[in-house]
Regions:
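A short, glycine/Asx- and small/polar-enriched loop/turn
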Residues: 95, 195-199, 250-257, 367-369
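Generic, well-ordered alpha-helical scaffold segments in large soluble proteins
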Residues: 15-16, 21, 25, 171-175, ...
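Mid-domain catalytic core of redox enzymes
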Residues: 247-366
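N-terminal glycine-rich phosphate/pyrophosphate-binding loop and immediately adjacent elements
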Residues: 3-132
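Rossmann-like flavin
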Residues: 92-199
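Generic structural signal for well-ordered, non-membrane alpha-helical segments
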Residues: 58, 101, 119, 123, ...
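Helical element adjacent to the flavin cofactor pocket in flavoenzyme catalytic cores
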Residues: 205-260
């Protein structure tokens, strides 16, 4: 019996994960990637012995990756080595205060008590609240698509009881009094483009997720995980075609029929998925269809969350005081975020996120760097 054919456009984390699932489910799957390496936005550069990852820097749920490899009876550890990051993050402020966010309760309690003894009990209540959110919003509903706030409430009335309509920062304030601690427990939304003063408190579940699963880094860099997924996909019989950009998703009578490549060749598929940018997908890949044009117009009118301005640099000496993840908060936390999200203005006293992977994996740079 002929296997159904599936195409995946884009070889980022989502595209490769889907391709592995399709191939494991019995599809004859092809991944089309326009660049010379897999990874999409999780691209990588190597220069003068340094490894520069363009992709995400934090892995918080290795169990999801384990499940993906287990679909075909494989083990994640046979393909990539995940290293535990400790502390998870070092947070610092302009007044000289630092806070190491670790997975050691006694060390956390000591740091919190040094700031405000009353917040030790408050933090424990916050952790219990985060655990409730984790069970409801991640374990029960992590696979459920929420297309709007109403659909979330219909699917999960318990989230209303947990006050998911309030912001992360507002809920954190219910538990701790110290401003530094409030920032330490609410900054996570910034890593996904959301303001802690406006993003639903359901995102406070990230704290429980990290305390449960840890924070990890792949030996060799984030792209080592991309390489692992691409290797697994090809071992399962999938086809990865690099430097092969897709031009359009072909359709007939309202149904997808295949992929037209940049060179003009059309290949037929039973199903096609796009892991490319969503606006690009509707405007370019499906721009010849009424649905594509209408969705592109709608999306262009939406308000998008901000991205990051990233500078990659290599240092000539080691800096042992640096931690893997260091976040330096500016002097105006609420005001600065308000300017970015409310006025689209980047002030001079912005906050910094410093990613120093050599603190965990010395192989990311030449010896002595």
């Amino acid at each position: 019996m002929t296997k159904p054919r599936a195409a995946v456009i884009g070889s980022g984390f989502g595209g490769l994960a889907l391709a592995v699932r399709l191939q494991s489910a019995g599809f004859d799957t092809t991944v089309f990637e326009g660049r010379d390496k897999p990874g999409g936005r999780a691209y990588v550069w190597h220069e003068e012995g340094f490894t520069f990852d363009a992709g995400p820097t934090v892995i918080t749920d290795p169990d999801c990756l384990e499940q993906l490899f287990a679909l075909s009876g494989r083990k994640l550890s046979d393909y990539v080595d995940l290293i535990s990051v400790d502390p998870f993050y070092r947070l610092c402020w302009e007044d000289g205060h630092t806070f190491d966010y670790v997975n050691d309760q006694a060390k956390l309690d000591a740091q919190i008590a040094a700031k405000n003894p009353a917040d030790v009990a408050g933090y424990k209540r916050f952790l219990a609240y985060s655990e409730e959110l984790f069970q409801e919003g991640y374990v029960k509903l992590g696979h459920v698509p929420f297309l709007d706030f109403k659909s979330m409430i219909v699917a999960a009335p318990q989230l209303m009881k947990l006050q998911a309509w309030r912001s992360v920062y507002a809920k954190v304030c219910d538990f701790v009094q110290d401003e530094h601690l409030r920032q330490a427990l609410s900054f996570h939304t910034l890593l996904v483009g959301g303001s802690p003063f406006a993003t639903s408190s359901i995102y406070a579940l990230i704290h429980a997720l990290e305390r449960r699963g840890g924070v990890w880094f792949p030996r060799g860099g984030t792209h080592a995980l991309i390489t692992a997924l691409a290797t697994l996909f090809q071992e399962l019989g999938g086809t990865l075609r690099l430097s092969t950009p897709a031009k359009t998703i072909t359709t007939q009578a309202g149904r997808v029929t295949g992929v037209e490549l940049a060179g003009g060749k059309i290949e037929a598929f039973d199903t096609v998925a796009s892991n490319a940018d969503i606006v690009h997908t509707y405007e370019k890949l499906l721009g010849h269809t009424k649905r594509g044009r209408s969705e592109a117009k709608r999306l262009k009118g939406a308000r998008f969350s901000p991205s990051l301005f990233v500078v990659h640099f290599g240092l000539k000496a080691e800096h042992p005081q640096m931690r893997h993840h260091t976040i330096c908060f500016g002097s105006r936390y609420r005001e600065l975020i308000g300017e970015i999200y409310g006025k689209n203005n980047l002030a001079n006293d912005f906050s910094l996120y410093l990613h120093a992977p050599c603190a965990t994996d010395k192989g990311q740079a030449p010896e002595g760097c």
